[in-house]
Swiss-Prot record:
Species of provenance: Yersinia pestis
NCBIfam families cross-referenced by the UniProt entry: PRK05408.1
InterPro entries per UniProt: Fe_traffick_prot_YggX, Fe_traffick_prot_YggX_sf
Gene Ontology MF terms in the entry: iron ion binding
Protein name: Probable Fe(2+)-trafficking protein
Assembly information from the UniProt record: Monomer.
Cleaved signal peptide residues: none
Function field: Could be a mediator in iron transactions between iron acquisition and iron-requiring processes, such as synthesis and/or repair of Fe-S clusters in biosynthetic enzymes.
Length: 90
């Protein structure tokens, strides 16, 4: 059974995560405040960041950068900026 939460990213009620997807306090906050839809948007941005900046998840500095970008995107309202990328026009 799905549960609805108020998603702080989307600023509306939406379906919550099925389980905590990220460890620690940030993970708890994501589980309680970020919907499946918002998480999906983050995963798309994360994939772009990893590919374009050639990040390695084996490198602790790359993981820290990705975590900071995630917090900025999900909780601070800052979009992910990738040099040379222009979003498609709607």
């Amino acid at each position: 059974m799905s549960r609805t939460i108020f998603c702080t990213f989307l600023k509306k009620d939406a379906e919550r995560q099925d389980f905590q997807l990220y460890p620690g306090e940030i993970g708890k906050r994501i589980y309680n405040e970020i919907s499946k839809e918002a998480w999906s948007q983050w995963i798309t941005k994360q994939t772009m960041l990893i590919n374009e900046k050639k990040l390695s998840m084996m490198n602790i500095e790359d993981r820290k950068l990705l975590e900071q970008e995630m917090v900025n995107f999900l909780f601070e309202g800052q979009d992910v900026h990738i040099a040379g990328y222009t979003p498609p026009s709607k």
